[in-house]
């Protein structure tokens, strides 16, 4: 086991430490060489929504192959990759995306919830009685899966089944970026109902490094990866939204650093100029712990 001390984020109330969050961190290059780490980088984790770039890449890749990539706008790629707030622009973008490809929004199987942003959620609750699937932070991702189903000539109604060609494409892409196969024991269901995949923390860091240093990827996957990073850098609002770290980070670094959060204290980053990737996981699932740890690492 590759272990050392995890990063520790202390939360104070006055002069007293009220809580401690322990975070495993790995930074490595595109060949998987570890540059530095805190904690156990061999720990198997579900990156949660930090997996979304690798769920988006198969769609961009097939559109490139079919020479229709120009029909997927930058903000559309960003929202497919994102975990959005369900703000007006987010919902409008997902709706127009589905309309463009003549897909009924009732086919979305992402579930419904109020916005991840409390102030946005409060406004939503005043406007409507119950949330809709379009408001789900994952509606963009699910729209992307439906579009991919359509271009593969696959049925749309069961696009979330693990054996569906869309999910098999995504599985293959994740295995490519991880550099290893994913056993059935490491496949489960994410909060939005989509299959999700677990792997060692260090391998997810390698996956993010490959987004920064694409020369080790097949040409079509490298091209799709570059398009994804560029789209998020130019349209950071659509990857998260108002008062969200993902949007702030991607807006500030303009593609030099790409970042994507995941539930239960996960975060992934790629560093374009360094050709490195980072993945971190807060052991107790704290979003606060993960974001403070990320800020510390970026500062260092």
Which residues does each predicted region cover?
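Short acidic-glycine loop/turn motifs at beta-strand connectors
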Residues: 28-31, 62, 271-274
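Structured C-terminal helix/loop/strand segments within mature extracytoplasmic catalytic/sensor domains
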Residues: 209-300
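Short Gly/Pro-enriched turn/cap motifs at secondary-structure boundaries
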Residues: 14-17, 135, 256-260
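Active-site SXXK
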Residues: 47-65
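Bacterial peptidoglycan biogenesis and beta-lactam-recognition machinery
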Residues: 60-70, 102-106, 153-158, 165-171, ...
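Active-site-adjacent helix/loop patches that line small-molecule binding or acyl-intermediate pockets
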Residues: 1-2, 72-184, 192
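Short glycine-rich loop/turn motifs
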Residues: 20-25, 143, 171, 264-267
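Beta-lactamase-like hydrolase cores
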Residues: 1-42
